Amino acid sequence: MMEIQMDEGGGVVVYQDDYCSGSVMSERVSGLAGSIYREFERLIHCYDEEVVKELMPLVVNVLENLDSVLSENQEHEVELELLREDNEQLLTQYEREKALRRQAEEKFIEFEDALEQEKKELQIQVEHYEFQTRQLELKAKNYADQISRLEERESEMKKEYNALHQRHTEMIQTYVEHIERSKMQQVGGNSQTESSLPGRRKERPTSLNVFPLADGTVRAQIGGKLVPAGDHWHLSDLGQLQSSSSYQCPQDEMSESGQSSAAATPSTTGTKSNTPTSSVPSAAVTPLNESLQPLGDYGVGSKNSKRAREKRDSRNMEVQVTQEMRNVSIGMGSSDEWSDVQDIIDSTPELDMCPETRLDRTGSSPTQGIVNKAFGINTDSLYHELSTAGSEVIGDVDEGADLLGEFSVRDDFFGMGKEVGNLLLENSQLLETKNALNVVKNDLIAKVDQLSGEQEVLRGELEAAKQAKVKLENRIKELEEELKRVKSEAIIARREPKEEAEDVSSYLCTESDKIPMAQRRRFTRVEMARVLMERNQYKERLMELQEAVRWTEMIRASREHPSVQEKKKSTIWQFFSRLFSSSSSPPPAKRPYPSVNIHYKSPTTAGFSQRRNHAMCPISAGSRPLEFFPDDDCTSSARREQKREQYRQVREHVRNDDGRLQACGWSLPAKYKQLSPNGGQEDTRMKNVPVPVYCRPLVEKDPTMKLWCAAGVNLSGWRPNEDDAGNGVKPAPGRDPLTCDREGDGEPKSAHTSPEKKKAKELPEMDATSSRVWILTSTLTTSKVVIIDANQPGTVVDQFTVCNAHVLCISSIPAASDSDYPPGEMFLDSDVNPEDPGADGVLAGITLVGCATRCNVPRSNCSSRGDTPVLDKGQGEVATIANGKVNPSQSTEEATEATEVPDPGPSEPETATLRPGPLTEHVFTDPAPTPSSGPQPGSENGPEPDSSSTRPEPEPSGDPTGAGSSAAPTMWLGAQNGWLYVHSAVANWKKCLHSIKLKDSVLSLVHVKGRVLVALADGTLAIFHRGEDGQWDLSNYHLMDLGHPHHSIRCMAVVYDRVWCGYKNKVHVIQPKTMQIEKSFDAHPRRESQVRQLAWIGDGVWVSIRLDSTLRLYHAHTHQHLQDVDIEPYVSKMLGTGKLGFSFVRITALLVAGSRLWVGTGNGVVISIPLTETVVLHRGQLLGLRANKTSPTSGEGARPGGIIHVYGDDSSDRAASSFIPYCSMAQAQLCFHGHRDAVKFFVSVPGNVLATLNGSVLDSPAEGPGPAAPASEVEGQKLRNVLVLSGGEGYIDFRIGDGEDDETEEGAGDMSQVKPVLSKAERSHIIVWQVSYTPE
């Protein structure tokens, strides 16, 4: 019975029940009725019809009711199945809605915080604007006050100007009247001169041109030495003239003239003039340096001060006129003329300025000359010139002194003009002083206004600071209360382990007692969020532990109380059996099977403490899912018998599996015999079954060695030198002869002519991937690399020690290629100085970390690769660098072991000077260095050849092919202590080319086009790139943060040119070139789940979740969820639900190889699922499913895992030619060869191993004749051979037990003589399968 339903996602759910139809049920009832009818016939034949006459209707009624009840029961069971599916979907929907609600609440909280922050910012802006408004109002008020003061000053100046103008008018009138009086007095004295000289010109004589007008010429000549015509006396300077002057004015006249000059100076400030009035006349207020002003400047000043001239005081003007007239009179030379002049002066009181002092007319010495300080000249020179000119000149002057004439006014005005010009100059200087003082005053007023405004601003800021202080105090109180509440919640959350709760409470009490409340640290919002996040993480871990404990208890209960595997009889049969049986006693109870005490360890408890400290959960080396505890009352033989009985139950369950085909150690579905009618096609299908070709412990001598990880060597893009084949150098132990044959394909045939190597050479893609496999193992003290050839897995090629810590991951990196990203793009646009010891930058959330120098080949010695470096701060001994290259003498040294201490040699001081400095970020150095282990025996003189190795030749002294450079293929190893090691994959394997200490444990490594992405346990990605010379540059790398440091990046996978990273329950899709996260999506609805494995092929990526048995398929481009496959029902069906804990299935290894999906579980079970072709969908409806070999919807009975969830892909019609790796559990194949513990890894390498290699084939080809086809037939069909290796602890054959029975001891052969059987079964085993497939 098949039903098809549409689920909510638009997909199709196909159901197929295993119940019999209604017709089958009726046949059962009819058979029962027939038997009852025959029994009634016998009764009637023996007795009579009356015996069964009343019984017959009752029996018929009972049978009819039985039929109806059976049919109803079947319907109820179908409905129950549908309701269960609906319940699962509703639970999924509920989880999704719950997650969405949680996200909505988180977004609401974020929006609320953002709005509150924005509100605070707006409030701050409003306060700032109010403060600016108050400041502008204050400035406007100050400007209004300044305008009012300026207007008042303007009105005062207008009044002063009017007063000066009126005074100037009066002065001119007085001056005109004075001139007229003077002219009238001189009319009588000049009449005789006019009569004696009638022909004299009425114009001014030319001899007086030495006295120019009031333009400052004479004044400009004061500063130098003036030599008049016919004068032998020299004027040195103004000081000499002043000192030699014998003419002194009275004290009162000088005071009067000083007061007049002060009165003529306008002063708006109300202060007294600084003009000295004690010893000099009014003209003495002019300083000496200003009195020596040039002629041009004085002329310009005279023109500009025209208005100032009009404001002169009339009294001062009268004094100047009197002085002018006197000075003119003094200059006469003869005694007769001097007497006339003296009479005029005596008759005019206004001209007699100094009545007490008379000049000595006989004195002609310059020492007796008069210094006219009003004009600043020596009057003696004027007198001497006038005396030498003669009396005619005086007559001409008197004759031309006509008030109404043109020249008379000019002659008489000469002295007055000089005095007026002097006063104008003084006035202009005083005006300039006044203007300067006004400017200073205005500046002071503006400064006062500014200071008052700043005072108001500071007052406002002080008020705002006080308010903010009050708010912060309130906030501090609130935070203290919240801190108390959070601490109490933290104590409650940590109260599960009582000791931890006591420690926390005591710690909190002591800390709170020591630090006062006012000095305690104030929590920010980020710190509170971190505290809440840690609390949630503790809750998640608690839930995981509870889940693991619950599983453990369930499994323990199933071990201690095994269910009886017999079919119970119905109550009706029991009723009839009691009715018709001869005896009424019940049958004896069947003896239950002997049980054994089996304790199943939780997968999370093994390394929980390490995961708590290092953010990772490594599987403990000594943990096994099954531990047998001995009973005190049982002997060893009894326990062995119980164990054999337990495995016999598993064997019976495996052999009694109906409809299954066993071939080559695999349990195959019955479809392989039913699909094709002809046998040839069936044989072709059977050839694709993986054939186990090898199963042995990895190293026979060391039983304590545990496997961790492995990787095949990728040699793509690397070619040795052409002269390597003919140079006569034997290949090193690290050089694989198979690789040499493949790489020299176009050269003559090599000396190695084994059939395996010939076949490997003929394959087209064998040059890209070698058959060598590097396997990481560890003991209690060290980690080692074991190199094997998959074609000869029993032979160890080489092994060497890496470090003292566990190596968690390994990856093969190909050689440098032209398709790699350019190394310059790694730095983007950042200006990073390569020589700067602290060069680091942040590029869009990406931190650039650099070392001290960008050394092209920073090869550190192996001694720095222990748990901690030997030298301080991670500075190991490096090769000598000369001109940017490594010294060849240093590069050819023998490689030492990982834990060897370097022997100091004579070149130690030279290398010590060239050591690179420590990393720029101190988090990369070990804060507490511990001494590394001492030198190991046999490691000082180079690598000691292993006893199991078949190539004991020493290593060559040089590397002619350049394989020792990191530009060739390399192997990258990541350790638990954070060290990253780079070794060559082609030669000199033991030598470490590069090493670097990272912040946390290295969990995964991938390579994409010249970029190596390293996943760390603190949630960050370290991205490395090559240098300009093609070698890897570990000194400069980028750190990309994906989340909180409490969660680790568990796995990574390369999908085309992108990298998928598993972080918590999310998958981040990263572009390595731009170092940006392109897409993030949830792989599981529960946040506490973790993505553990990723496997990519075609357009699909398979994802596994921790503690989950369901595989999820996602589209590589659209990231759409395509399919779910649950392997737990399949494993339970194949191995039994209660046998050996196989009902608890967790996926620990995942690989896509040979067109198959390989799944390894935590119980050591290996499952191989063939991949199917693309599902063709149209509008979300299933139109067809074309399988590679079979169809999951074919008419086969219901199988575990047959319920396939197929989700619609809208873009599938656009990419119809792409391959999406769907798979169906109806085609799943389970291998009977497994491990005792979890499957640690799967590795796929090309190779072709003959089925009869040393009896290593686990299952005879007779069990499955298909895989033993001749090689020519395989090559004729263009099949591709691949070897798949699995590694794990111990070995179990589920058909015969875990290898401790007698059959295993007999099959072991000579191996049973080396170690006891029990220890051999617990050693680390590798199992190798060969798969032949046709590539799509």
Swiss-Prot record:
<dbReference type="GO" id="GO:0008432">
    <property type="term" value="F:JUN kinase binding"/>
</dbReference>
<feature type="region of interest" description="JNK-binding domain (JBD); essential for its function in axon elongation">
    <location>
        <begin position="209"/>
        <end position="225"/>
    </location>
</feature>
<dbReference type="InterPro" id="IPR039911">
    <property type="entry name" value="JIP3/JIP4"/>
</dbReference>
<feature type="domain" description="RH2">
    <location>
        <begin position="520"/>
        <end position="594"/>
    </location>
</feature>
<dbReference type="GO" id="GO:0016192">
    <property type="term" value="P:vesicle-mediated transport"/>
</dbReference>
<dbReference type="Pfam" id="PF16471">
    <property type="entry name" value="JIP_LZII"/>
</dbReference>
<keyword id="KW-0963">Cytoplasm</keyword>
<feature type="modified residue" description="Phosphoserine; by ROCK1">
    <location>
        <position position="314"/>
    </location>
</feature>
<feature type="compositionally biased region" description="Polar residues">
    <location>
        <begin position="184"/>
        <end position="196"/>
    </location>
</feature>
<dbReference type="GO" id="GO:0030426">
    <property type="term" value="C:growth cone"/>
</dbReference>
<feature type="modified residue" description="Phosphothreonine; by MAPK">
    <location>
        <position position="275"/>
    </location>
</feature>
<dbReference type="Pfam" id="PF09744">
    <property type="entry name" value="RH1"/>
</dbReference>
<dbReference type="GO" id="GO:0046328">
    <property type="term" value="P:regulation of JNK cascade"/>
</dbReference>
<feature type="region of interest" description="Leucine zipper-like domain (LZ); essential for its function in axon elongation">
    <location>
        <begin position="423"/>
        <end position="458"/>
    </location>
</feature>
<dbReference type="GO" id="GO:0019894">
    <property type="term" value="F:kinesin binding"/>
</dbReference>
<dbReference type="GO" id="GO:0030424">
    <property type="term" value="C:axon"/>
</dbReference>
<feature type="region of interest" description="Disordered">
    <location>
        <begin position="182"/>
        <end position="211"/>
    </location>
</feature>
<dbReference type="InterPro" id="IPR034744">
    <property type="entry name" value="RH2"/>
</dbReference>
<feature type="coiled-coil region">
    <location>
        <begin position="58"/>
        <end position="177"/>
    </location>
</feature>
<feature type="region of interest" description="Disordered">
    <location>
        <begin position="719"/>
        <end position="766"/>
    </location>
</feature>
<dbReference type="InterPro" id="IPR032486">
    <property type="entry name" value="JIP_LZII"/>
</dbReference>
<dbReference type="GO" id="GO:0000139">
    <property type="term" value="C:Golgi membrane"/>
</dbReference>
<feature type="region of interest" description="Disordered">
    <location>
        <begin position="879"/>
        <end position="969"/>
    </location>
</feature>
<dbReference type="GO" id="GO:0044297">
    <property type="term" value="C:cell body"/>
</dbReference>
<dbReference type="GO" id="GO:0030159">
    <property type="term" value="F:signaling receptor complex adaptor activity"/>
</dbReference>
<feature type="coiled-coil region">
    <location>
        <begin position="440"/>
        <end position="554"/>
    </location>
</feature>
<dbReference type="GO" id="GO:0005737">
    <property type="term" value="C:cytoplasm"/>
</dbReference>
<feature type="domain" description="RH1">
    <location>
        <begin position="12"/>
        <end position="100"/>
    </location>
</feature>
<keyword id="KW-0225">Disease variant</keyword>
<feature type="region of interest" description="Kinesin-binding domain (KBD); essential for its function in axon elongation">
    <location>
        <begin position="50"/>
        <end position="80"/>
    </location>
</feature>
<keyword id="KW-0968">Cytoplasmic vesicle</keyword>
<dbReference type="GO" id="GO:0030425">
    <property type="term" value="C:dendrite"/>
</dbReference>
<dbReference type="InterPro" id="IPR015943">
    <property type="entry name" value="WD40/YVTN_repeat-like_dom_sf"/>
</dbReference>
<keyword id="KW-0597">Phosphoprotein</keyword>
<feature type="compositionally biased region" description="Low complexity">
    <location>
        <begin position="260"/>
        <end position="269"/>
    </location>
</feature>
<feature type="compositionally biased region" description="Polar residues">
    <location>
        <begin position="270"/>
        <end position="281"/>
    </location>
</feature>
<feature type="modified residue" description="Phosphoserine">
    <location>
        <position position="676"/>
    </location>
</feature>
<dbReference type="InterPro" id="IPR036322">
    <property type="entry name" value="WD40_repeat_dom_sf"/>
</dbReference>
<dbReference type="GO" id="GO:0050821">
    <property type="term" value="P:protein stabilization"/>
</dbReference>
<protein>
    <recommendedName>
        <fullName>C-Jun-amino-terminal kinase-interacting protein 3</fullName>
    </recommendedName>
</protein>
<keyword id="KW-0991">Intellectual disability</keyword>
<feature type="modified residue" description="Phosphothreonine; by MAPK">
    <location>
        <position position="265"/>
    </location>
</feature>
